[in-house]
Amino acid sequence: MSSGTKRALADIIRRPLITEKGTRLLEENKYLFEVTPGANKIQIAQAIEELFSVKVTKVNTFNPPARQRRVGKYLGTRSSYKRAIVTLQEGDSITLFPEV
């Protein structure tokens, strides 16, 4: 795979999300990521497989709505984002944080 294609796949995955739900999902071999809003499930699975050398069995995506926020007297919106819950094959795992 060329370095340009690998870089494009790396741009799909923005960051892992560490939330209460995300830590519960780790026990089920599922990982929570923030991804670019235009990415589809196939692209997300390919990116995870290439970046972490694991086998993805399932991808669930979720687009929470953009929220309105008030800053002083001005009303604005928080940027929207897309989440992906990635299920890995039995026996595979991703090390999100190195052991200390």
Swiss-Prot record:
- Gene Ontology terms: biological process: translation
**InterPro entries of this UniProt entry?**
Nucleotide-bd_a/b_plait_sf (IPR012677), Ribosomal_uL23-like (IPR013025), Ribosomal_uL23/eL15/eS24_sf (IPR012678), Ribosomal_uL23_CS (IPR001014)
The superkingdom of the source organism is: Bacteria
Keyword Amino-acid biosynthesis found: no
Keywords of this protein's UniProt record, alphabetized?
Ribonucleoprotein, Ribosomal protein, RNA-binding, rRNA-binding
Q: Which GO terms describe its cellular component?
A: cytosolic large ribosomal subunit
* GO molecular function per UniProt: rRNA binding; structural constituent of ribosome
Q: For this UniProt entry, which segments traverse the membrane?
A: none
Q: How does it assemble?
A: Part of the 50S ribosomal subunit. Contacts protein L29, and trigger factor when it is bound to the ribosome.
| Protein function | One of the early assembly proteins it binds 23S rRNA. One of the proteins that surrounds the polypeptide exit tunnel on the outside of the ribosome. Forms the main docking site for trigger factor binding to the ribosome.
Q: Which family does it belong to?
A: Belongs to the universal ribosomal protein uL23 family.
Q: What is this protein called?
A: Large ribosomal subunit protein uL23
**What organism is recorded for this protein?**
Gloeobacter violaceus (strain ATCC 29082 / PCC 7421)
At the highest ranks, the source species' classification is: Bacteria, Bacillati, Cyanobacteriota, Cyanophyceae, Gloeobacterales
Which gene holds the coding sequence for this protein?
Answer: rplW
